């Protein structure tokens, strides 16, 4: 065992585009002794930033015990471990179990946030997730599958709020997804965008509504790595709509901590 204390970094690798990797994440990759990356989800070019002398492992075939064994062994030898996740580790990143094991073994760890696919997709669609007068709330969720949802978190219940919905890990169950949106009272013309592999070379956006989005997704043969985005914020004509409220933040007639309202302004 080394006298030098090792450390594990949980790194958000972003949605795919290596230019969306944070500077801090890049810096850690360049000094890490061990790199464990989600090779089924993280763009391979992200690993190109790794220290040339680093041991690199793909995690798609590793279970929790195997992964944490690598992390614990490296830490006991005073090494730096970069555990690279896709997007941001805090959103469906499955890192809590690893952190518990590290904590129980007195191993230091740190989370380095990344650009989540939801935000990269919003940028790709050239919209905001929170549009004044349309939706000021965002729900991150998924359909119930093999992993059950907690009570009161079924999609039909969450969708009843009518706010912006970002639905992860559900692309293979679009018919069920649309059915739950209908059950929640969404109109048939509700805008839906499906963002596939945002930031990758094969990036694709499919637009539709409740009447056709399931068929469009099936026809495109998309079964993985896609985010379903639901709500008026994703209307393809959002930039041309006249009935969308303007933000008060920069309105001449709005007073806030750093600026007084201009007299007689609307």
Q: Each predicted region: which residue ranges?
A:
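Active-site catalytic pocket residues across diverse enzymes, especially alpha/beta-hydrolases
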Residues: 50, 125-129, 181, 185
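A generic local structural motif
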Residues: 20-24, 43-44, 68-70, 126-127, ...
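Class I SAM-dependent methyltransferase SAM-binding "motif I" and its flanking Rossmann-like core
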Residues: 6, 17, 88-90, 95-161, ...
